[in-house]
């Protein structure tokens, strides 16, 4: 059974990163000591490390550690062994391109479908659908396919 939270945004006006979601995330990820973070969407072009640090600071407030997938030599094993997964927002074209480039899109879909708790915000939500073709993001890079995870049977536009 899938265990997913699909959020349109990570930050509400006048609040901190993930602040509005933290009560729900503490329940959603209650059995997780460490979350695997996928920072590939890189909002405003920040580095994977900067984005991971930002997300880790938020999760620390609910006593959950976070580690970026880019820190692993084998991202497929990291996904298969993850207690929980969070894909952050940013540019959907960049995110999907990196998921294909790192050959992890199928594994990510499989672990979510098998019940690993998942959080997606913005672009991380868009990829839950069948394709990314509803995104409003600028096409800054051309992914090899517009097909995404298909963990829900429809497409999402996170910022309609």
Specify the residue positions occupied by each region the protein language model found:
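Short amphipathic alpha-helical segments
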Residues: 18-19, 49-50, 97-100, 131-133
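N-terminal beta1-alpha1 cap of cysteine-dependent amidohydrolase-like domains
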Residues: 1-84
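Flexible gly/pro-rich beta->alpha loop and the following alpha-helix that scaffold active-site loops
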Residues: 64-116
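Short glycine-rich anion-binding loops that position phosphate/pyrophosphate groups of nucleotides
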Residues: 10, 41-43, 90-93, 123-124
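Class I SAM-dependent methyltransferase SAM-binding "motif I" and its flanking Rossmann-like core
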Residues: 97-98, 105-160
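Structural motif
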Residues: 5-6, 86-88, 119-120, 156
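Short, hinge-like loop/turn segments at secondary-structure boundaries
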Residues: 53-54, 85-87, 135-139
């Amino acid at each position: 059974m899938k265990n997913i939270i699909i959020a349109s945004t990570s930050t509400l006006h006048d609040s901190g990163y993930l602040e509005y979601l933290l009560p729900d995330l503490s329940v959603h990820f209650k059995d997780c000591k460490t979350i695997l973070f996928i920072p590939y969407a890189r909002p405003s072009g920040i580095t994977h490390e900067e984005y991971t640090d930002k997300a880790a600071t938020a999760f620390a407030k609910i006593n959950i550690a976070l580690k970026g997938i880019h820190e692993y030599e084998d991202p497929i094993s990291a996904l298969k062994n993850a207690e929980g997964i969070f894909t952050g927002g940013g540019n959907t074209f960049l995110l999907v391109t990196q998921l294909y480039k790192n050959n992890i899109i199928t594994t990510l879909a499989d672990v979510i479908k098998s019940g690993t708790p998942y959080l997606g915000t913005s672009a991380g939500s868009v990829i839950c659908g069948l394709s990314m073709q509803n995104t409003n993001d600028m096409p800054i890079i051309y992914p090899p396919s517009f097909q995404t995870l298909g963990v829900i049977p429809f497409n999402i536009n996170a910022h309609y």
